[in-house]
Amino acid sequence: MFMEEKQNSQISLDFNQNIFKPSSREEIVEIVKNCYRKNIPLEINGLKSKNKIGRNFQSEKTLDLSDYKGVIDYKPEELYIKVRAGTPIKEIVEELDKNNQQLAFEPNDFGYLFSGESNSGSIGGVVSCNFAGSRRFKVGSVRDHILGFQGINGKGEIIKSGGTVVKNVTGYDLSKLISGSFGTLTILTELSIKVLPKPETSKTLVIKNPHLKKALDFLG
């Protein structure tokens, strides 16, 4: 089921609360603008699956993007999917499974380490951390699969870059810049991501060898 952005002519927000859970881009813009005008530190959260990584952020307000989710557009034949940043990884995987496709960079699943649930992170968090799995050696990291994005900077201004095709960039590729920026450059709102067919077969090998040279020789 694809989602459509709701355009609100009037936005009513309670700026006295400490945690904001917007469901539209317009609400996010107003929240950021208000915090910018009042010089209020704002913490950005998705599904909080990686909140235990790094030091605690000192903030007065929290922007919770867990409600800003959903598949916006998916074209299996054109090998791309467009989603909101708060969309859980598991929902994207389920959608791609219907057409035997995948996120080829294999997002790292730290759910069992931090939250106790598999695939508990959001796609925005994966891109912000640039976390890819072991297949990155063959297919590249997260940043190599981002076709385009929309985001909001610290002043509440909307930023757009790229599109939905591979060769669509002239000048500096901002999609690669925001990957791994941990939310410091923009609040991601939408992402267009390249998808690929699943392999017919796959295997996982565990090599138990304490000697680095022998392990490297085995990998050839």
Give the residues covered by each predicted segment.
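Short, functional N-terminal and low-complexity linear motifs
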Residues: M1-F2, Q58-D64, E117, F182-L188
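Short amphipathic beta-strand starts and helix->beta connectors
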Residues: F2-Q7, D64-Y68, I187-S192, D217
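Glycine-rich N-terminal segment of FAD-binding domains in flavoprotein oxidoreductases
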Residues: I11-F110
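Short, hydrophobic beta-strand segments that form beta-sheet elements in well-ordered domains
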Residues: E4-K6, L42-I44, I207
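FAD-binding subdomain of flavoenzyme oxidoreductases
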Residues: F105-E106, S115-G220
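Active-site-proximal helix-loop elements at catalytic-domain edges
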Residues: F2-N18, I89, R136-N153
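A generic structural signal for ordered alpha-helices
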Residues: K6-L13, S49, G70, V127, ...
